[in-house]
């Protein structure tokens, strides 16, 4: 085989020809680094987040059709693109040409915040529209199922793209003739108050129409190439790897014969992650290209034969067509496969992964192989020696040599037989998330009865996720042959299968008892569903099923359907150009949607730029015995390796060590940094650094271990109000309890990133970073380099999400990179991979709350004694502040007359946990709400009644003796009760629960009072700089960081109001310590407030200075006023400053005025749970908030919704797993699940109270970004109510030990029944668990 001279494909309509191709190159770095198309983003590198989505188009010479489909560029080898047309976000529209409607609508519907995920969203939707110009809502949800967003909560994205759907209208409540945006209470429109107008969040008449004729045409050259059907195998050779692309079946078999160990790669979704994450290397890869025999679709009298080269998306489409055409009795297996194909991965992976690759990979959690195994499927395999058939059975799945493919064979096709009359095939799965998540357990089950007799003739049951491969319960099934289909058979089957499909207590993946329960819960579902079918076919054969059991037959599907948004009215007397109070689009929204928004790693490489990669500790607590750098230093491209020894006394900054010196304190601690010419060279060399460790004791991982070892960061914090001990003596009842709450990964879409550029003179250094705290980077870099701070400047254009995770961690990276940059006089770039980021950086603090409550029988809590413990990790970071804020906010909406709360930050051997949105309140508030809920249960009262009876009075005092006016708390609560129709729906929920046994619903309403402030005047100061240029344009700079919350947009709104000029006249370049020095970190939802007051101050200074000129020419323009000022030597620049609110707290006295104001609200959520699987769906959520006067309702609603969904994830599905050795397992989207589009409430309603009072804040506004996280616990408590209802129906005590998150595992195991009692349980201490709680 001769090497191919060139690789030819198209990108955005432009021809690309590569003559020297490295087969190890993926499309993503090629687009970004080679073609400089940086709109396609790196999010995870494993196909799990969708940030790198592009569209690929190929011409099929057989069908004469062009296929458009989305793929993950991070997993797409560039060698696989021969003859393809690639379309990126830049190729469909731009601000300099024309916007595509897909780009325009997501921006105008306020569907972008940080914007990092937006290009991927845009391309997924674009690919859908190329195939379905008027998609259905189901197709829309399916298309976006592989795209993650951490900011928006998805609602505005769906609303934007619903406008393309067949059923799309801006509302779905048209019976009364009113738009959903104008719905009032009970569907009646609200009466507008005089002198007020309601601004629309978006305007439908402004949409650009979708015009398919304006799309990029498929390159004719590629059609001609495809029609010619080239016969020559293409071979691309790199330094380490050879890529072979046969174009005929004969050539493929020849290649496989020559290189029998080479994997056959179609979509690279299995081999690719193995190479990237497991270090598996393949010197030769065989990748067939458009071989017709591998794409066959053949119908025979016995069934359907599908080519192994078909993508899973194609298989899904084929099966959907087949089930419409063949009789239902013949389509059982096809329907079951379709069910799993709808949730398997995301659309991008399904379009890349092939049927054959999925089968051959034999992953233990494969969704299709259990079904194919029970369906009596056959594999047709080929080699040069000929063709043969292999049964897809247990032996094949367990890789028995005699039942497997030989090394020189390839899988050509799969035969899937028709099912028969009296034969039933069903599919089951349960995952942490409904879509785009690997199954915890899945199953395929098939039964065949004798003609009309109800006797089992054949039975096949397979499970995935419960062993090293797919497990077939062959022996159990054999013993059940000849049995009647009844409950006695079911009971026997459960016991047989539990014996045969045994899981050791230390099984990988953990959740052992849950998996055991799912094994037989699925079997029971199979029994019920088959019984129901038999009831329809032959009523006499079916065992009797109670009506209340029928709900078990339906899976939970909660597709988002609609929302209502009730923001505030704008005073009609407001100047028309005054944008304050209007839903102004995020000013980077369009740039987000076109890929033109520049993030740090989008910046072009600096001349002679170096790359930095870290070596991290694999031990939780160990002594560094020796470090051998010689082999790593000898590798090509390696320039240097930085260790703690090089940094000397600059290695410690405050409490943080930049690099480990003699001892490591956690897995993931930075030990040294490799500096090399390229990213690949740096990462390869990092693997060759040899470090010898000696383990040390103790290794403390959990809060309980820290308490036992008295391992705390000092000091203890304490607040006390009243006399707790005396109050306990006079109460009616006392209860004690505790709750453990797991941590949370920030999962910002843009990973930690830094670029340090030495300026070449005076030791000046420019640092570009994705950070919330540029001043801290400036200070740390200056300290490490022993320079005055004025030599170091830190610049931030925008940040692709942060949530508190980019306050301190980026500073360590920047300081080490700066040391190397300074030493070598060359720029140094460092971009963490997703797994590195999650391993190194820490997240939200896990919490343990212990409480003792004394209360009266009417629910009034008289005394409360609470202890808070947080898992701080191995260094202090912000752990003390998190404990302090948790204590100051722990009482939430309630006045406890006697309160004592104490808090400790635990020192453990985990990566240091840090700031996270909410800053202690999501944990502290949950502890209090759990206590309230338990009190209600003890009193026999409803939780909402006990909550209301303990509310703050209108004028009251907090435990730290700050005065409070809680009028809006009560108003939010009452409005939420009314708007959610709480009491009516509670009756409906009770009725539903009485009529259903295996499905239960829960309804919960939670209030909140979120204090806003930083507890210090110094932390609240802010500054700004405003320039007016002679053409009348304005440049504004301030100290806040744009990380998705829209602070730059709000600052321009402030300038527009104050200077009475259009927003289009105002520009903001970014944030820099060069223009605004000595800034505080951006966080705590105070960024717009504090910096806005500084901007306002600067504008007022300018206006005062220019007052004589403006008075002299009141009808003039800013251009005229600026020129006149210049002529009179009047400065057109002004700094603005805000000193911070008067806030303080004296911890010794336990009193002070730490907060400027309070944000009030309430959230009501309704859920439905599946008691057999632990699955849940959120049916509806209503949120009412007091936001003061909203500066920008669109941005503020986005903050509320995004925070709520993030909080919902925190309390339900986001789960971190650590090994007993302290190793974090959850290092990417495949292991750690944040909410996806499938998880949001089916109905979401957000209401802002009208502004009710003037305040000292910016235009009487309130910060909202943090408070909304806690509202997610309304879903948590709704799940609790549903579980309690299930337990009561089973005669169990309703209260049960709560912990967060309430995952499917915890929900299922709390719904105790005969199946949970049937499973074997391992004695604690008899095995080493796979994971441990921390």
Swiss-Prot record:
Looking at its record, which EC class is this enzyme? oxidoreductase
Per the annotation, how and in what number is the cofactor bound?
Answer: Binds 2 [2Fe-2S] clusters per subunit.
What subcellular compartments does it reside in?
Cytoplasm
Q: Which residues bind FAD?
A: 264-271, 345, 354, 358, 367, 411
| GO cellular component labels | cytosol
The UniProt annotation places Mo-molybdopterin binding at: 113, 151, 802-803, 1043, 1084-1087, 1199, 1264
PROSITE patterns, per database record? 2FE2S_FER_1, 2FE2S_FER_2, FAD_PCMH, MOLYBDOPTERIN_EUK
- Keyword Flavoprotein assigned to the entry: answer is yes
What EC number(s) is this enzyme filed under? 1.2.3.1, 1.17.3.-
Q: How is its activity regulated?
A: Inhibited by hydralazine and menadione. Not inhibited by BOF-4272 or allopurinol, xanthine dehydrogenase potent inhibitors. In contrast to guinea pig, human and rat, isovanillin is not an inhibitor but a substrate for AOX1 in rabbit.
Entry-annotated residues carrying Phosphoserine:
1064
Q: Which reaction does it catalyse?
A: an aldehyde + O2 + H2O = a carboxylate + H2O2 + H(+); retinal + O2 + H2O = retinoate + H2O2 + H(+); all-trans-retinal + O2 + H2O = all-trans-retinoate + H2O2 + H(+)
Question: A GO molecular-function term, please?
Answer: iron ion binding
Q: Name the positions where [2Fe-2S] cluster 1 binds.
A: 44, 49, 52, 74
Per the record, the major location class is cytoplasm
The superkingdom listed in its UniProt entry is Eukaryota
Q: Which residues form the 2Fe-2S ferredoxin-type domain?
A: 5-92
Q: Which SUPFAM superfamilies match?
A: 2Fe-2S ferredoxin-like, CO dehydrogenase flavoprotein C-terminal domain-like, CO dehydrogenase ISP C-domain like, CO dehydrogenase molybdoprotein N-domain-like, FAD-binding/transporter-associated domain-like, Molybdenum cofactor-binding domain
Known NCBIfam families for this protein? mam_aldehyde_ox
What family classification does the UniProt entry report for this protein? Belongs to the xanthine dehydrogenase family.
Q: What is this protein called?
A: Aldehyde oxidase 1
């Amino acid at each position: 085989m001769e090497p191919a001279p060139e690789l030819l494909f198209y990108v955005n309509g432009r021809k690309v020809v590569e003559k020297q191709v490295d087969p190890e190159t993926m499309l993503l770095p090629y687009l970004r680094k080679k073609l400089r198309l940086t709109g396609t983003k790196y999010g995870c590198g494993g196909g799990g987040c969708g940030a790198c989505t592009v569209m690929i188009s190929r011409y099929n010479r057989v069908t004469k059709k062009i296929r458009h489909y989305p793929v993950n560029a991070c997993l797409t080898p560039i060698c696989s693109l021969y003859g393809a047309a690639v379309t990126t976000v830049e190729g469909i529209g731009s601000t300099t040409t024309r916007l595509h409607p897909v780009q325009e609508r997501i921006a105008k519907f306020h569907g972008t915040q940080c914007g990092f995920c937006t290009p991927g969203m845009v391309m997924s939707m674009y690919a859908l529209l190329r195939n379905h110009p008027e998609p259905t809502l189901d197709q829309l949800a399916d298309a976006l199922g592989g795209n993650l967003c951490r900011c928006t909560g998805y609602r505005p994205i769906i609303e934007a793209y619903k406008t393309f759907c067949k059923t799309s209208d801006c509302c779905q409540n048209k019976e009364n003739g009113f738009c959903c945006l104008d719905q009032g209470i009970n569907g009646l429109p609200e009466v507008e108050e005089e002198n007020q107008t309601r601004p629309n969040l978006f305007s439908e008449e402004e949409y650009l129409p979708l015009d398919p004729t304006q799309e990029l045409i498929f390159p004719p050259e590629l059609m001609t190439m495809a029609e010619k059907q080239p016969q020559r195998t293409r071979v691309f050779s790199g330094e380490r790897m050879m890529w072979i692309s046969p174009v005929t079946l004969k050539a493929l078999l020849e290649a496989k014969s020559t290189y029998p160990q080479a994997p056959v790669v179609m979509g690279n979704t299995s081999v690719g992650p193995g190479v990237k994450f497991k270090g598996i290397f393949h010197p030769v890869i065989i990748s067939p290209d458009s071989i017709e025999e591998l794409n066959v679709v053949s119908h025979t009298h016995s069934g359907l034969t599908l080519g192994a080269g078909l993508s899973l998306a194609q298989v899904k489409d084929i099966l959907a067509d087949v089930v419409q055409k063949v009789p239902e009795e013949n389509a059982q297996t096809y329907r079951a496969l379709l069910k799993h194909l709808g949730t398997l991965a995301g659309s991008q992976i399904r379009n890349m992964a092939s049927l054959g690759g999925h089968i051959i990979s034999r992953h233990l959690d494969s969704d299709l192989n259990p079904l194919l195994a029970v369906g009596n499927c056959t594999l047709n395999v080929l080699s040069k020696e000929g063709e043969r058939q292999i049964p897809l059975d247990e032996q094949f799945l367990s890789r028995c040599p005699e039942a497997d493919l030989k090394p020189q064979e390839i899988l050509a096709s799969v035969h899937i037989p028709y099912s028969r009359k009296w034969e039933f095939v069903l599919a089951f799965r349960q995952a942490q998330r409904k879509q785009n998540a690997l199954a915890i357990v899945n199953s395929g089950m098939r039964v065949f009865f004798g003609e009309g007799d109800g006797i089992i003739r054949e039975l096949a049951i397979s499970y995935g996720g419960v062993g090293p491969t797919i497990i077939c319960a062959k022996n159990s099934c054999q013993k059940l042959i000849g049995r009647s289909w009844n409950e006695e058979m079911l009971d026997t089957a459960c016991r047989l299968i539990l014996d045969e499909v045994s899981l050791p207590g230390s099984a990988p993946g953990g959740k052992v008892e849950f998996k055991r329960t799912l094994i037989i819960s699925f079997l029971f579902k199979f029994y019920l569903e088959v019984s129901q079918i038999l009831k329809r076919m032959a009523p006499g054969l079916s065992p009797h099923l109670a009506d209340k059991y029928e709900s078990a037959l339906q899976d939970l599907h909660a597709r988002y359907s609609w929302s209502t948004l009730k923001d505030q009215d704008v005073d009609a007397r407001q100047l028309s150009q005054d944008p304050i109070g209007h839903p102004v689009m995020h000013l980077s929204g369009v740039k987000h949607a076109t890929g033109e928004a520049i993030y740090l790693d989008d910046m072009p490489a600096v001349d002679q730029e170096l790359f930095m990669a870290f070596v991290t500790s694999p031990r939780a607590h160990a002594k560094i015995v020796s470090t051998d750098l010689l082999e790593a230093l000898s590798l090509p491209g390696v320039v240097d390796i930085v260790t703690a020894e090089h940094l000397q006394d600059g290695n410690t900054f405050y409490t943080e060590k930049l690099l480990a010196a003699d001892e490591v304190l956690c897995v993931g601690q930075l030990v040294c940094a490799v500096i090399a010419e390229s990213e690949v060279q740096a990462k390869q060399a990092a693997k060759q650094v040899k470090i010898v460790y000696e383990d040390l004791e103790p290794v403390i991982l959990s809060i309980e271990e820290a308490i036992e070892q008295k391992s705390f960061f000092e000091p203890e914090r304490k607040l006390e109000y009243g006399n707790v001990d005396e109050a306990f003596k006079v109460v009616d009842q006392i209860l004690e309890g505790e709750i453990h709450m797991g941590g949370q990964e920030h999962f910002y879409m843009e990973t930690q990133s830094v670029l340090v550029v030495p300026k070449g003179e005076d030791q000046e250094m420019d640092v570009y970073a994705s950070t919330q705290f540029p001043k801290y980077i400036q200070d740390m870099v200056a300290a490490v380099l022993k320079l005055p701070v004025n030599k170091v400047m830190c610049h931030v254009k925008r940040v692709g999400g942060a949530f508190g995770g980019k306050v301190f961690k980026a500073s360590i990276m920047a300081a080490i990179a700066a040391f190397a940059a300074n030493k070598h006089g060359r720029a140094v770039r460092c971009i963490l991979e997703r797994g590195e980021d999650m391993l190194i950086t820490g997240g939200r603090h896990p919490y343990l709350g212990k409480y003792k409550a004394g209360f009266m029988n009417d629910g009034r809590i008289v005394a409360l004694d609470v202890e808070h413990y947080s898992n701080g990790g191995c260094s202090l970071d912000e752990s003390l502040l998190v404990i302090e804020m948790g204590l100051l906010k722990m009482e939430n909406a309630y006045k406890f007359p006697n309160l004592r709360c104490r808090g400790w930050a635990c020192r453990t051997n985990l990566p240091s946990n840090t700031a996270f949105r909410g800053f202690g309140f999501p944990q502290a508030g949950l502890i209090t709400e759990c206590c309230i809920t338990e009190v209600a249960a003890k009193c026999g009262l409803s939780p909402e009644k006990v909550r209301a009876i303990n509310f703050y009075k209108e004028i009251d005092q907090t435990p730290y003796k700050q005065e409070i006016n809680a009028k809006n708390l009560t108003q939010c609560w009452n409005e939420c009760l009314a708007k959610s129709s709480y009491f009516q729906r509670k009756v409906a929920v009770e009725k539903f629960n009485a009529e259903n046994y295996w499905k239960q619903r829960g309804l919960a309403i939670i209030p909140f009072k979120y204090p806003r402030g930083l507890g210090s005047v110094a932390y609240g100061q802010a500054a700004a700089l405003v320039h007016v240029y002679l053409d009348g344009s304005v440049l504004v700079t301030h100290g806040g960081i744009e990380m998705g919350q829209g602070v730059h947009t709000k600052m321009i709104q402030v300038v527009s109001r104050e200077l009475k000029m259009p927003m289009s006249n105002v520009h903001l370049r970014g944030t820099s310590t060069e223009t605004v020095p000595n800034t505080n970190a951006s966080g705590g939802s105070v960024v717009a407030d504090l910096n806005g007051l500084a901007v306002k101050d600067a504008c007022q200074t300018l206006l005062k200075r220019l007052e004589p000129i403006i008075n002299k020419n009141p009808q003039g323009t800013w251009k005229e006023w600026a020129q006149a000022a210049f002529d009179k030597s009047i400065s057109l620049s002004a700094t603005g400053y805000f000193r911070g609110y008067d806030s303080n707290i004296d911890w010794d006295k336990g009193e002070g005025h730490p907060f400027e104001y309070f944000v009030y609200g309430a959230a009501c959520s309704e859920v439905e749970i599946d008691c057999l699987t632990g699955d849940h769906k959120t049916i509806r959520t209503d949120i009412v908030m007091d936001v003061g006067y909203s500066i920008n309702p669109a941005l503020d609603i986005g903050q509320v919704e995004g925070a709520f969904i993030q909080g919902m994830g925190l309390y339900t599905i986001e789960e971190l797993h650590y090994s007993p050795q302290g190793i974090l397992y959850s290092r990417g989207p495949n292991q750690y699940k944040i909410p996806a589009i499938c998880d949001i409430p089916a109905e979401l309603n957000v209401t802002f109270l009208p502004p009710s009072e003037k305040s000292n804040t910016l235009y009487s506004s309130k910060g909202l970004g943090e408070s909304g996280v806690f509202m997610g616990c309304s879903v948590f408590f709704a799940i609790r109510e549903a579980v309690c209802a299930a337990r009561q129906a089973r005669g169990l005590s309703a209260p049960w030990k709560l912990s967060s998150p309430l995952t499917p595992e915890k929900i299922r195991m709390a719904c105790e029944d005969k199946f949970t009692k049937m499973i074997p349980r391992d004695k604690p201490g008899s095995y080493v668990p796979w994971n441990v709680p921390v």
